[in-house]
Amino acid sequence: MRCSQREVFVKREEPTNPEWGKPPSQRTADEYIRHSFVILDKPRGPSSHEVAAWVKKILGVERAGHAGTLDPKVSGVLPIAVAEGTKVLMALSRSDKVYVAVAKFHGDVDEERLRAVLREFQGEIYQKPPLRSAVKRQLRTRRVFSLELLELEGRYAVIKMHVEAGTYARKIIHDIGEVLGVGANMRELRRVAVTCFTEDEAVTLQDVADAYYIWKKYGDDTYLRSVLLPIEEIARHLPKIWVRDSAVDAVCHGAPLAAPGISKFEVPFSKGDIVAMFTLKGELVGIGRALVDSEEVKKMERGAVVRTDRVVMRRGTYPAMWKKGQRAAKT
């Protein structure tokens, strides 16, 4: 998957004061680590929690968190945020996923019939989580964007599936087997993408360890900066809103982002969408939910535009130019 390119609507041209904040590329190595995340290629065997704990230990930070749990037997793309970056993991909470599964059918299947059944499973489907699940087992709907047969050999099939967050790939394979009348089970599963973060840019635990060692031993952070991504990248797939210097600290204290505090923004977005708020230097301030759609923002001169849900920027990075008294978001 690729992130779609959005147009930028300029509400008001605004300079940024170089005395406040700094572009992400100018952060020191320590600052960079604390405001970073990594697209990890999780191996089969350990749990997602164990892998995140290893990243935390390697980088010497107090916390690390992952988005989109992978079972121990599943490999592939696992985004892990570090230190301050964990505050905005919800940016990936509703992200769609792409998997490649190896299915074994319990009887012979016709290729054309299989392709036809795969087409039937595209769109809205009903699913009940499997018995061994961390969530309540109640019927729910999930969207399947595409199912593609990559290979069929004997009773084994390789199927690529692009699905909504929270979809159980194993259950899809089981249900396909039921519709075909032969039964099926999943033999192997790999996640190849989380939204527009793909396995092509994923790194291994060894890469993370090597990059950190080279920086500590030789003072060269070049490899470190290629293995870890700046936390700003976690919002790659989200609509972006650039905040005027005068409004940044209010958002850092949890205030809603109001129309006068906006310099420019990407279009389109709808009411209720998760959006990312950036400084004019390109620093991620936080994320929240749009209270209005982008077309309305174009005309607004006052009023709240974004409800601030999570803040990653430290308070006081930009000077306070606002009236206190508004409720703070979680930081």
From Swiss-Prot:
GO terms for biological process: box H/ACA sno(s)RNA 3'-end processing; mRNA pseudouridine synthesis; rRNA pseudouridine synthesis; snRNA pseudouridine synthesis; tRNA pseudouridine synthesis. The keyword Secreted does not apply. The keyword Glycoprotein does not apply. Residues 1-27 are annotated as: Disordered. SUPFAM superfamilies: Pseudouridine synthase, PUA domain-like. GO terms for molecular function: RNA binding; tRNA pseudouridine(55) synthase activity. InterPro entries: Dyskerin-like (IPR012960), PsdUridine_synth_cat_dom_sf (IPR020103), PsdUridine_synth_N (IPR002501), PUA (IPR002478), PUA-like_sf (IPR015947), PUA_sf (IPR036974), tRNA_PsdUridine_synth_B_fam (IPR004802), TruB_arch (IPR026326). Residues 1-15 have a biased composition (Basic and acidic residues). The active site is at D71 (nucleophile). It catalyses: uridine(55) in tRNA = pseudouridine(55) in tRNA. Coiled coil: none annotated. Keywords: Isomerase, tRNA processing. Residues 238-313 form the PUA domain. Its EC number is 5.4.99.25. It comes from the Archaea. Could be responsible for synthesis of pseudouridine from uracil-55 in the psi GC loop of transfer RNAs. Belongs to the pseudouridine synthase TruB family. Type 2 subfamily. This is Probable tRNA pseudouridine synthase B. It comes from Pyrobaculum arsenaticum (strain DSM 13514 / JCM 11321 / PZ6).
